[in-house]
Amino acid sequence: MLSIDDHGGGGPLAVDIIPAGSGAQKTAPDAADPSLHGPGRANGDAVNADATAAEETGSRDDESQQQQQQQQQQQQQQQQQRSLLSERDLDQLWQWNAVVPETIQRCIHDIISEQAAQRPQDVAVQSWDGSLTYSELEHLSTQLALHLRLLGVDIGVTVPLCFEKSKWTVVALLAVMKAGAAFSLTDPSQPEARLQTIVEQTGAKLLVTSALQSSLGAKIAPGATVVAVSQATFDTPLQQSSDPLPDVPSSSLMYVIFTSGSTGKPKGVSISHENFTSGAIPRAEAVGYKSTSRVFDFPSYAFDVSIDCMLCTLACGGQVCVPSEQGRMNDLSGSIRDSKANMVHMTPSVARVLDSDIIPSLDVLGLGGEVVSGSDAATWRQFTHLIIGYGPSECTVGCTVNNNTSLSTGIGKGVGCVMWLVDPEDHNVLVPVGEVGELLIEGPVVGIGYLGEPAKTAEVFIEDPTWLTAGHGCYAGRHGRLYKTGDLVRYEDNLSGSIEFVGRKDQQVKIRGQRVELTEVEHHIQTCLPTGVKVVAEVIKPENASPTLVAFLAEKSSVGSQDGSLFVDPSPELSAALDKIDTTLGAKVPKYMIPAAFITLASMPTMVSMKTDRKKLREIGISIPRSKLGATHADEGPQEEPETDAEKKLAHAWQLVLASSSPVYKASSFFGLGGDSLRAMKLVSAAREQGLGLTVADIFNNPTLSAMANKSTSISSATQEQVKPFSLLQEGWDEQTARKDVAELCGIEPEQVEDVYPCTPLQEGLMALSSKVKEAYIAQRVVVLKDLETAKRLMAAYDEASRGSPILRTRIVQVPRRGLMQVVVNRKLEYTTGNNVAAYLASDRETPMDLGTALWRYAIITDEAAGTVSFVLTMHHALYDGWSMPLVVERINQAYQHPGKPLSRPSEFKDFIKYLLSQDAAESEKYWRAQLEGAHRLQFPLLPHQGYQTAADELLEEYVPLEQLPKNATVATLIRAAWAIVASQYINSTDVVFGETLTGRNAPVVGVDEIEGPMITTVPLRVPVDAEAQVGEFLQAIQEQTVGQIPHEHFGLQHIRRLSPDAREACELRAGLVLHPSADTAAPEVDATLPANNLIPHLAAREALKFNTFALMLVCSMDPKGFQVMASFDSKMVDKSTMRRALAQFKSVAQQLAQSTTTLLGNVRALSDDDAAALRDVVATAQEDPVVKTYDGASAAYIVRSDDASKMVPVGAIGELAIQTSQPKDLSTLPVPSWLAALLPPSAPTDALYLTGKLARYDAAGKIQVLGDKASLTASTDASAAARKPRVSATSQRQRRLRALWSHVLRTPETEIGLDDSFFLLGGDSISAMKLASEARPEGIRLTVAQMFSHKTLAEMAAVMECTDESSDSTAAAAAEAPIAPIAEPFELLDGLVDDKSAFLANVVKPQLQDASWTVSNVLPTRFLQELTVRATISKPRFAVRYELIFFDGPVDLRRLRQSCQRLVAHNEILRTVYVESADRIYAAVLDALETPFEEFAYTNPAVDLSTFTKDICRADVDKPQPLGSSFVKWLYVADPQRPAARSCLVFRMSHAQYDEMCLPIMLRQLSALYAHDKTPEPSVPFSAYVSHVMRTAVPASLPYWRELLAGSTITSFRPDIPITDRRHAAIAQTVDISARTRDVTLASLPTATWALCLARRRALRDVVFGEVVSGRNVGLPGAESIAGPCWQYVPLRVRFDPSWTGNDLLAFVQQQHVESAGHEAVSLREIAENCGLGWEKQASMPGDDRPAQWWFDTVCHQDVSHVKERENTDEEAQTKYETLYTDEEPLREWKVQTYVRDGGNSVVLEVVTFKSWEEHGKGLLADLVKAMEQLVHRPGEKLFSD
C-alpha cells in the first residue's frame, strides 16, 4: 500500500485516469469528455469524437435497454436463483469485501504543497498560455487564497469557477481550497441558462473566472462578486487578509460536480476532501502515476475527470499538460504530441482516430467510458501499458481499475472501496456470484450526497443493508454507508473479483458518452411546446441508422391519421414551436441533449398500468424512415401516388437508395427526402437495375419523381461492352511492343503484363508529387488479428481479391514519348514477414513506391512477445480513394467469407479510362476557357508574397446546424454558395474562384459507383456573387453550374491552367473545398469475423486533411442535421483569429441561405458577433494607427467596403482606406456610415471621412495594412505585389536558360516567370543572387551579383549575362570550362608569415597537438572573426561553443551512427581542423584524419525529461578544458540502454570557428545521408579554398574599394553618458508592419537604411559609419554557397546624407552600396583598418573592451534573413528533430540592432540589444527606430531632414 510519507523521491501518489480528448467533435462546445469510467458514469464520460463514438455509445444504450427487458422477463427465474445463494457464494463475496479501505483524512492541496516544497523548480503546469513551476504555483495560489479570504470566502462556502482551458484554472482551484471553500467547476461553452442554474444552486456570493469569461461570470451570477484571474491580477500586490489561511478539515466539502437531473435541472454531487483523497491514493498505485508523469488535460471542466487531471497529477509531483481549447478539440494528436504527454486516457473510439505515432509514445493509455473490445485491447497493449476503469461521480472520480487487460477487458476491481452486487429491486438481497445485479459501492469514496436534495440522497445513499450488518461466518457484520449506482454488473468467471459491466436498470441513458436523465430532456422540451403535448424522450435505433435521441410527441387534440398510421402531422401551433425548437432548447441544455428529431404520433402507446410503453416506442423507432430524422416535418406538396411504370420503378429505386420505406409521391423531391450527390450517383445504378437510364445531371436538373421519370430512358439491364486488353493503347503502339516496353520498366517478363492503358490526370499529379516527397500520398494500415490461422486466411482472401481486381495489381510507369501509363501485372503476389510492427512500419516507410514498382504491398508481422499477429497493408493514393477503398474491402471480405466465389462488378477502372479517352478534349477546353475568362485574380487567402510556398499548419472546426433546406437544393450547393459569399468580402470582389475536390463519379459509366480505383478530381469553381440576386436564384445557378461541368470535371487542373492566362491565374487555387456526403447507413461496428474492415479509416473526412495541398482546405462532412467543417490552413497566410471569424461567418451565411430563398444576397449578413466585437476594438484605437500619421491633419483612419461603405469590412478583409480629418482634402467625401457611428466611442472625432483610393485591410493585431492604389490593385493583384501585368514568355534561348535557373533557385515554376518579372519581387535576395551566380557557372553562364541588382528583370538579366555557348542547349562544353573552386597548395598561405615552413610545422604546430600521431596536411592563418571565436572556445565564457541536439524518435543503429559521425568529419576538412597559436596569432592545422571523441551516456533518470538531461550533460561538458591543439568537434550520445527503441539524442559539439549558419544545415544533411547508407553526401567546398581565394585574390582586389569608400570617415560612436554597472544583456523589441514598402527594395536594405537614419538624427550627423553582418560568400568563388566553414564577416557601411534626400533616395543609396560592396565583403574589419590608412585607431574602445578600437564597431546592424535563420526541423531519413544550445552567453561589445522577417515579409521585428545599464536609453532608441522605419515604409517620398 502506498504511503503518503514526506519522501523526496516524489513517487506515485494521487491518480486518476485522465482523458485525452477527441479529434473530430461534431459540436465542439458540447463535446463530452472520455474517462476511464464505465457506462454508469455520473457526469458523462464517453466522447462525441466522431460518428463511430456516437454509434458505439448508442449501441451500448440500446443493449442496456434490452438488458432491462431481459431482467423483467427473467425476474421469476432469478428470484429462485437468489434464494439459492450458497454458502460458497457468501464465502467468496465476503472474502473479496472483508476489509473496507482506510479513510485518509487529508486534503489534497496540502499534499500538493508538500510536493512544492520538495521540487520548487520543477514544472507543475505546462500550458498553451505559459508554464508554472511548483514554487510559482504555490505562491500564486496562496496569494489568491488570502485575497479570497478578504472577500469573505471561508469554510462552508462554495465558489463556482468559470474558465476556458488555462494554467490559471489550476491556480484558482488550489486557492479556493486553501481558503477553506469548496469549488464547482463549470464549462463556459454550455448554455448560459444552464450555468446560471448551477450557480444558483451553490448559493454563491462570489465567482472566480478567467479574464476572458468575466463578462459571462457576471451574467450567470448576477449580484455576485466576480474575481477575474490572469497575469494582470498578480502584477500589482493583491489586497489580502491579514489572518493566516485556515486548517481545512478533511471532512469538509471539497467540490460540487453537477450531473443530469431527473427534475429538469442539473443535480449537484457533493464530495468531501477525505472522499477524494481516499480514492486518489489507491488509484495512483493501481495506475502508476509518478513524478515523471506528464498528463494530458483534455476533460471539460464540467466533468469531474478534469479535477483528477489537475490535482492527482500535482499530488504525484507530475506535470499537467494543458492544451488550448482549439488544440484540445481540433488537433488532438498534434496537441498530445506537442505536449510530450506520456499518460493519456480516453474512450476506445477516440484512441482509434489518434495518429499512429501517439499510442506508442505513451507510458500509460487509459480506456473507459465505453465497452473495450478484445481487439482494441490486443492492439494497444502491445505498444503501451493499458488501463480500463469505471466510476460514478457520487463516489469521487473512479472506483475500479483493471490494470491487467491481458486477462480481461472488464472494469476491474475496486480501489478505495469494496463492491457488492444486489437484487436491482431489493438492495437487501445479495445475488450469487456470476449473476447480474445492481452494483453498490461501500467505502470512504462514497460522497456526501446531492446538494439540497435530502430525499434523493436518502434514496440512493443507503446505510446498513441487512446482509452487511449480519456478516457471514467468520466475517463480522459492520455498519456502512453505500451508494446504489443503478448499474447492472456481474462478477467475471475467473473468480478474481473483477467486474464486468452489463447495463442500466433505469431510464438513465448515455448520449455521446454523457450520462443523461431522459426525464430532464423531457422537462426542457415541454417548456418549449404548447400546453397539452405529451413528450417522451427515447434513444432509438431506426432501420439502417445510428442510435439516436428523439422526442415522441402526442397532442391531446390530435385526431389521428385517416389511414390509421401511427404518425400524424403536427398542428399549426405545434409546428410553429418545432420550427424554432433547436434554438429555444439550445439555450437551455447542452447540444447533446437536443433530440435529432421530433416525431408526432396519433397517440402515445401505454401499458395496462397506463404508463408509457417505452418498449413500444423503441419498436416504432426501428421503423422510422430516414426522412423523419432530418427535420421535424416535411412539405412534399400534393400526395399523388406514382402512376406510370417509370414512376413506380423510380420510386422503388428512391426507397432503396434513401434506405426508407416511406411512400414516395409524384411531387416528392429526391433532395427534399434526404438525397444528395452521393445518393444521386447510387440512384443511377439503382435505376439501371430497374431498366431506367439516368445520369447524375438528370437527377439534379429534375429532382421531383415525375420530372425524373419523364427524363429517364428505358434501357436493357445488360452490362456494357467489355473493354478488351490493350485496346486503349495509343495509335502506333501495338500489344507486343507495349508488353516489352512496360515489362522492362517494371522488371518483369512481357507475358506477365495483362493490360496497359493511360493514367488519369489525377494519377499523373499524385505520382509527380510522390516522386518529390517519398512518403507523399502513401498510407499504411494495420489490422491486428487473433492468431496466425486468421492471418493466413486473410492473406488468401487478399490474394484472391487481387486476382479479381486489376487495380490491386496495377503499377505506373513513365514510357518515353508516351507518358505515364498504368500496367496491370499478372504475377504471384509477394509479401513480407516480421516480428515487430513498429520496426516494420519504420522500415516500410523507407521503401519507396516508385514508378515501375508495386503500389500495393502487405506484410504479416508475428509478435510473439505481445502474442499478436498483424496484417499491414501499404498503398499508394494513385490507386485508391475514399470511395473505392470500401469496395476493395468488400471484395476481400467476399473472398474471406466465400472463397472461390468472387464478387462481380459491372465495370472496371479501365471502363472509366475508356470514357475519359472518348471525351472531346476540344469541348472541355472550350468550356473551361469560357468559365475562367476574365476571372478575378485575387483569391482568399492572400499570398504574403509572390513565390511563397504554402504549407497548412493549423486546424479549426465548426459545426453548422441547418434547420431546413430550400426545396430542391442540396447541402453541397448551400456550402459552395456560403463560402463564395464569405470569400468575396475578403478579396473585395464579387468574382470568386476556389477549388473543389469531387468524387468524380458523375461520369455516365455503367456501375460507376462500383468501380475500384481513384476517380476524385479537383476543379476550379468560379462563382459570381450578385448582390441583387435572390438566394433561390443564386443556389439554382450554382447547382446548374456544377451539373454543367460534369462532362469536363476530369480534364485535369494541369491541363486547365495551360488554356489561357486567365485560366492559369484561376488555377493558382488558394482555397479548396472537399465535400463528404452523409452515408446511406450508419457505419457498421467492426465485425471481428471480417478483419479487413479495419482497413477503412474511421474518419474519411479527417483522412482527407493528410493530403492538403491548399493554403486553406475546407473539408465538410454532411449529416441530416447540417454539416461539420474542418479548416486546415497556413497560418502565415491567414492568421488563426481571422480564420476563426471566417468560419463563424461561413456558419451564419449558410444558415441564412437555408432559411429564405427570396432574400437578396446583398441583405445576407456576412458578419458575425465576433466580427463586430473585433471591429469595435480596432475602431476604438483608430486614432492611434500609424497610417494616420501619413496624412496631414488626419485624426483617425478606418476601412470601409469599397463598393458599399454602408457595410462593414471584417478584420482581415480588403476594403478602401478612409481617413477622418478636419482639413479638407482633394478626395471623395463620405458620410460617416451608421455602423461606424454605432461603434465609435463618445470621445471619437466627428470630422468628415475621405476615401483615399487605397485598398487596405486590418491585420491580426488590428493595425491597418495598406495594400496599394485601388485602381492598380483591383482585380489584378495579391496583397503583396504591385499590379500584375500580362506575363510575357521567354522567347530566346538565353532567356529560357536563365528562366530555368531562376526556377531552380527561387523554387518557382517556369510557367510563373515572365520576361518582366523581377528576380527580387519573386522572392530573391542577395543570398539567392549569389546562389544563382554559382548555379549559372556550370551551365556556361556568367553573372555577377552586382549585375543582378542592377538588372533585376529576366529580360534585363538575360541581356547582360555572358554565355560560353549560345548556339546549343547543351551545356556540357560550358560546364567543362566552368571554373572550379581553387585548391590551395599545402602550406602556401604561410608565405610571408613564417620564415621556415618545415621548422614552423615541427617546432610550433606539432608540439601543440593533443595527439602526436596526428598527421598535418595543411596549415593556414585564420580569418579575423574565426580567430575571435577560437579564443571564445578555449577560454571561459565559451560563448562560441555550440551544441546541436539531434533527437531520434525511433530505434537507432548506434554502430552506423558512430560511423556516420566520423565519416562526416572525414568529408569536411573544417571539422578535422585544430588550432594552434604563434606570436599572438591563431593558425588552423588541417589533419589528414581525425577520430573525434564519441561519448555515450545512459539516460536512467526518468524523473528528468531527455532534453533537460542532455542539456545538463552539455553544461558539464563545456566546463571541461578545450585547449589549443585539441578537437573542438565532439559527439555525445544519450539513450536508455534498457529501451533501445525509445527516444534518444545525439549531440554535435563544434566551435563557431568551424561553421556559420549557411554551412551547418549542409553538414546536417550530409550526416543524414551518411546514416542512410544509400545516399552520397552533397559536396561542400573546402574552407582552405575559400581562405586561399580571399587572401590571394579578394583582399588585394577589395582594399582599394574600401579605401575610397571610407576615406575621411570615422566609426560613428553611440554611447550614452551613463556608467556601465550592469553588463548583462537587455533586448527590447517591437514588430513593425512593412507591408506597404517599396517592393523593389530588398528586405536587407530597409533596416540598414532605418538604422542609418536613426543614427544620423540621434548624433546630428550627415555622415555615419557602422557595421553590418554579411555572409562573406559574395567573393566570386564557384560553389560559394557550399563552403564548409565560417565565412561571415562584419563590414562597414557608410551613408553620407544629402540634405535634399527623401526616403526613396536613402533606400536606393543603401541598396546600391550593398550591390557595390557585395564583391568585397570577405575583407575583415581588421584588414580594412590596418591597410586603408583611415586613422580609426585614434578612437576609444568600448568600455571594458581591451582590444584595439579599430577592430570593432560601436554599433552593428544585423539582418537575420529567413533562409539563414530557418532550417528543417525534421530529418525525414532518420526521423530526427533538432534543438540548439549555447551554454554560455556572449559578452556584449557593442550596440546591436537586429531584425527578423515575419509574416512572409509583411512585417519585421526590430530588436535593440545593449547593456542592462543602458536599457532605458535603448527603449528610446527603439522608439526612434520604429518612427524612422515607418517613415521609410509609409512616406518614402517625404524629405528626411527639415531645412
Swiss-Prot record:
Residues covered by region (Adenylation 1): 133-528
Record keywords: Ligase, Phosphopantetheine, Phosphoprotein, Repeat, Virulence
Domain of life from the UniProt record: Eukaryota
EC primary class: ligase
Region described as Condensation 2: 1447-1734
Annotated stretches, region: Disordered: 1-83, 628-647
Chain intervals with Low complexity compositional bias: 65-81
O-(pantetheine 4'-phosphoryl)serine PTM positions: 677, 1326
Signal peptide, first to last residue: none
Disruption phenotype: Leads to increased sensitivity to oxidative stress and iron-starvation, reduced conidial germination as well as reduced virulence. Impairs the production of the 6 siderophores beauverichelin A, dimerumic acid (DA), Na-dimethyl coprogen (NADC), fusarinine A, fusarinine C (FsC), rhodotorulic acid (RA) and tenellin; but increases the production of mevalonolactone and eleutherazine B.
Pfam families: AMP-binding, Condensation, PP-binding
GO molecular function, one term: phosphopantetheine binding
Keyword Acetylation: no
EC code: 6.3.2.-
Ranges where the record places region Condensation 1: 753-1175
Coiled coil (UniProt feature): none
GO cellular component term, pick one: cytoplasm
Biological process, per Gene Ontology: amino acid activation for nonribosomal peptide biosynthetic process; secondary metabolite biosynthetic process
InterPro entries: AA_adenyl_dom, ACP-like_sf, AMP-bd_C_sf, AMP-binding_CS, AMP-dep_synth/lig_dom, ANL_N_sf, CAT-like_dom_sf, Condensatn
Keyword Chaperone: no
Cofactor(s) the protein requires to work: pantetheine 4'-phosphate
PANTHER family listed in its UniProt record: FATTY ACID SYNTHASE, NONRIBOSOMAL PEPTIDE SYNTHETASE
Comment on protein domains: NRP synthetases are composed of discrete domains (adenylation (A), thiolation (T) or peptidyl carrier protein (PCP) and condensation (C) domains) which when grouped together are referred to as a single module. Each module is responsible for the recognition (via the A domain) and incorporation of a single amino acid into the growing peptide product. Thus, an NRP synthetase is generally composed of one or more modules and can terminate in a thioesterase domain (TE) that releases the newly synthesized peptide from the enzyme.
UniProt record similarity statement: Belongs to the NRP synthetase family.
Functional description taken from the UniProt entry: Nonribosomal peptide synthetase; part of the gene cluster that mediates the biosynthesis of at least 11 siderophores, including beauverichelin A, dimerumic acid (DA), Na-dimethyl coprogen (NADC), eleutherazine B, ferricrocin (FC), fusarinine A, fusarinine C (FsC), metachelin A, mevalonolactone, rhodotorulic acid (RA) and tenellin. This cocktail of siderophores for iron metabolism is essential for virulence, and more specifically for the fungal virulence in penetrating through the host cuticle. Siderophore synthesis is also involved in conidial germination under iron-deficient conditions.
Name this polypeptide is given: Nonribosomal peptide synthetase SIDD
Organism: Beauveria bassiana (strain ARSEF 2860)
